[in-house]
Swiss-Prot record:
Motif LD motif 2 location, chain numbering: 87-99
Function recorded in the entry: Functions as a molecular adapter coordinating multiple protein-protein interactions at the focal adhesion complex and in the nucleus. Links various intracellular signaling modules to plasma membrane receptors and regulates the Wnt and TGFB signaling pathways. May also regulate SLC6A3 and SLC6A4 targeting to the plasma membrane hence regulating their activity. In the nucleus, functions as a nuclear receptor coactivator regulating glucocorticoid, androgen, mineralocorticoid and progesterone receptor transcriptional activity.
Region Interaction with PTK2/FAK1: start-end pairs: 78-131
PTM comment: Phosphorylated by gonadotropin-releasing hormone-activated SRC.
Keywords, alphabetical: Acetylation, Activator, Cell junction, Cytoplasm, Cytoskeleton, Differentiation, LIM domain, Metal-binding, Nucleus, Phosphoprotein, Repeat, Wnt signaling pathway, Zinc
Region described as Transcription activation: spans on this chain: 1-195
Sites of Phosphotyrosine modification: 55
Chain span(s) of sequence motif LD motif 1: 3-15
Comment, domains: The LIM zinc-binding domains mediate glucocorticoid receptor coactivation and interaction with AR, CRIP2, ILK, LIMS1, NR3C1, PPARG, TCF3, TCF7L2, SLC6A3 and SMAD3. The LIM zinc-binding 2 and LIM zinc-binding 3 domains mediate targeting to focal adhesions and actin stress fibers. The LIM zinc-binding 3 and LIM zinc-binding 4 domains mediate interaction with TRAF4 and MAPK15. The LIM zinc-binding 4 domain mediates interaction with HSPB1, homooligomerization and targeting to the nuclear matrix. The LIM zinc-binding 3 domain mediates interaction with PTPN12.
GO BP terms, alphabetized: cell fate commitment; epithelial cell differentiation; fat cell differentiation; morphogenesis of embryonic epithelium; negative regulation of fat cell differentiation; positive regulation of epithelial to mesenchymal transition; positive regulation of transforming growth factor beta receptor signaling pathway; positive regulation of ubiquitin-dependent protein catabolic process
Phylogenetic classification of the source organism: Eukaryota, Metazoa, Chordata, Craniata, Vertebrata
Organism per entry: Bos taurus (Bovine)
Molecular function terms, GO-annotated: I-SMAD binding; metal ion binding; nuclear androgen receptor binding; Roundabout binding; transcription coactivator activity
The protein's name: Transforming growth factor beta-1-induced transcript 1 protein
Length: 456
């Protein structure tokens, strides 16, 4: 396009120098008429000065007049003009070869209505400020006929003008007639598209533009919730596709697009709803278990809640003991529920002795008077207490009053005590008192002779 503008500028300069020849002064022909000079003030399309010059140079005049005989200086100018027109036709043929690419580029880069209106106002203000050059009396020469590329360019510019005018008007107003072009007599302008056609065209252009940019426009499947096609953002989960606003928690309807979720029976749930509805409950606090879990005694527990119900300490390597469905540590279980020793009343943990209808620690089953262990495994019982032989007879009064040993055979009962037969003697002469006669003084037995001698 820059080459075309430069060539048109050269042609304008060449045309401006033509009136200087003497032949033109004798018979000034009519000035060259362009389609833009015949249009009224209300029919101006708002195009720039370069575009006006392009139309006035390319378009075929309506009624060309025969030119006067050319003088030698004028024939040289005509040769220069013919060469320029040939160059213009060559450039237009190249433009015709790339018309489809130009059309796509123009349609994809439509300016907004505000920008177009601003450009038209600026162009009109510049045209008013710019002084109009005096018409140069140059002869009208026969020009080559417009080529097919020229016709195609006129049709494209007319369509573009129609589309811009339609965008400027409100949707409810009537559709204005298309702006006339320079080739309106040869090629009629296409009718303005309807609103539905314009919408379909714009949607098609948008879809093609997105496709060229690598953005997919086809449906990405049916939503797993509303069963409608998905276009745009999509969430893929549970083997299906979802609209982002439809992939929500099955309990509280919270959006789950960018957060973690749990699945139950094919439905997504947020962590709060999933744990509240489907997680096992702790046997102590009755709250849902979210992470680690201990299974014992037919129920589930938080690890920090599975502890001794008596002391509250967690169970170590020694494990736990159960009583009526409740866990206890070993120490508290034995302290609360283990059998008690009859001697020390402490819990029996290991070995024990069963005697006198009770359980005893081996170290606690001794004589309850002297705490001496029983030799030979035999013991004597008195009032439910185990005693050795001596303390048993002492409790029952069956010890010899002289030697202090138990009396197991024959005995002599005197003075409220028991004696071995050989140990019941006179306190002074130590003779046995076998005859059964004796005297007593201060709780001691005496024979008759010694009593008379001592106390006579």
């Amino acid at each position: 396009m820059e080459d075309l503008d430069a060539l048109l500028s050269d042609l304008e300069t060449t045309t401006s120098h033509m009136p200087r020849s003497g032949a033109l002064k004798e018979r000034p022909p009519e000035p060259l008429t362009s389609p833009l000079t015949q249009m009224g003030p209300g029919e101006s399309s708002g195009a720039s000065g370069d575009k006006d010059h392009l139309y006035s140079t390319v378009c075929k005049p309506r009624s060309p007049k025969p030119a006067a005989p050319a003088t030698p200086p004028f024939s040289s100018s005509c040769g220069v003009l013919g060469t320029g027109l040939c160059e213009l036709d060559r450039l237009l043929q190249e433009l015709n070869a790339t018309q489809f690419n130009i059309t796509d580029e123009i349609m994809s880069q439509f300016p907004s209505s505000k920008e177009t209106a601003g450009e038209q106002k600026e162009d009109q203000s510049e045209d008013k400020k710019r002084p109009s050059p005096p018409p140069s009396p140059s002869p009208v020469l026969p020009k080559p006929s417009a080529t097919s590329a020229t016709l195609e360019l006129d049709r494209l510019m007319a369509s573009l003008s129609d589309f811009r005018v339609q965008n400027h008007l409100p949707a409810s107003g009537p559709t204005p007639p298309p702006v006339p072009s320079s080739m309106s007599e040869d090629t009629p302008s296409p009718p303005g598209p309807t609103s539905k056609g314009s919408l379909d065209t714009m949607l098609g252009l948008l879809q093609s533009d997105l496709s060229r940019r690598g953005v997919p426009t086809q449906a990405k499947g049916l939503c797993g919730s509303c069963n409608k096609p998905i276009a745009g953002q999509v969430v893929t989960a549970l083997g299906r596709a979802w609209h982002p606003e439809h992939f929500v928690c099955g309990g509280c309807s919270t959006a789950l697009g960018g957060s973690s979720f749990f699945e139950k029976d094919g439905a997504p749930f947020c962590p709060e709803c999933y744990f509240e509805r489907f997680s096992p409950r702790c046997g102590l606090c009755n709250q849902p278990i979210r992470h680690k879990m201990v299974t014992a005694l037919g129920t589930h527990w938080h690890p920090e809640h599975f502890c001794c119900v008596s002391c509250g300490e967690p169970f170590g390597d020694e494990g736990f003991h159960e009583r009526e469905g409740r866990p206890y540590c070993r120490r508290d279980f034995l302290q609360l529920f283990a059998p008690r020793c009859q001697g020390c009343q402490g819990p029996i943990l290991d070995n024990y002795i069963s005697a006198l209808s009770a359980l005893w620690h081996p170290d606690c089953f001794v004589c309850r008077e002297c705490f001496a262990p029983f030799s030979g495994g035999s013991f004597f019982e008195h009032e439910g207490r185990p005693l050795c032989e001596n303390h048993f007879h002492a409790r029952r009064g069956s010890l010899c009053a002289t030697c202090g040993l138990p009396v197991t055979g024959r005995c002599v009962s005197a003075l409220g005590r028991r004696f071995h037969p050989d140990h019941f003697t006179c306190t002074f002469c130590l003779r046995p008192l076998t005859k059964g006669s004796f005297q007593e003084r201060a709780g001691k037995p005496y024979c008759q002779p010694c009593f008379l001698k001592l106390f006579g």
